[in-house]
């Protein structure tokens, strides 16, 4: 048990020393690390700077702010066809409560397992 503790302590110490070496490589040839930032490039004086664009407010919308009211369509004529020689219009009303989207298929359909083939 003491041997495992000594070996793990040595490994931790070696990892700490290796990490400490990496911090001291600020000026190395691998990118410079976190040294001083590069100086800003000198401004170019070959042409005068363009004047900044003046701020222009956005144009007002061309549509009315209030929505246009659209009239409701007329109630359709529902005709009840029967064996009688006349057509009678059926008044519009709310649909009756039903089984929802299941409709007539609200029960599970029976599934029969086929008999295994005998060899």
UniProtKB/Swiss-Prot annotation:
Cellular compartment(s) = Secreted
Q: In which tissues is it expressed?
A: Follicle cells.
Instruction: Using the UniProt record, give the first listed, main subcellular location.
Output: secreted
Tell me the superkingdom of the source. Answer: Eukaryota
Enumerate the spans annotated as VM domain.
Answer: 69-106
Q: Name one GO cellular component term.
A: vitelline envelope
Belongs to which family?
A: Belongs to the vitelline membrane protein family.
Which segment of the chain is annotated as a signal peptide? 1-19
The question of whether Membrane is a record keyword is answered with no
Task: State whether keyword Glycoprotein applies.
Answer: no
Name of the protein this chain belongs to = Vitelline membrane protein Vm34Ca
Q: Which gene encodes it?
A: Vm34Ca
Q: Which UniProt keywords apply?
A: Secreted, Signal
Purpose: Major early eggshell protein.
């Amino acid at each position: 048990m003491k041997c495992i503790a000594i070996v793990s302590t040595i490994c931790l110490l070696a990892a700490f020393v290796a990490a400490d070496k990496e911090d001291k490589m600020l000026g190395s040839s691998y990118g410079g690390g976190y040294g001083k930032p590069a100086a800003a490039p000198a401004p170019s004086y070959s042409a005068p700077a363009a004047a900044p664009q003046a701020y222009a407010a956005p144009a007002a919308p061309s549509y009315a702010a209030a929505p246009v009211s659209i009239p409701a369509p007329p109630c359709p004529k529902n005709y009840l066809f029967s064996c009688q020689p006349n057509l009678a219009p059926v008044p519009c009303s709310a649909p009756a409560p039903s089984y929802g989207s299941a409709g007539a298929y609200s029960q599970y359909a029976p599934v029969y397992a086929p008999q295994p083939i005998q060899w």
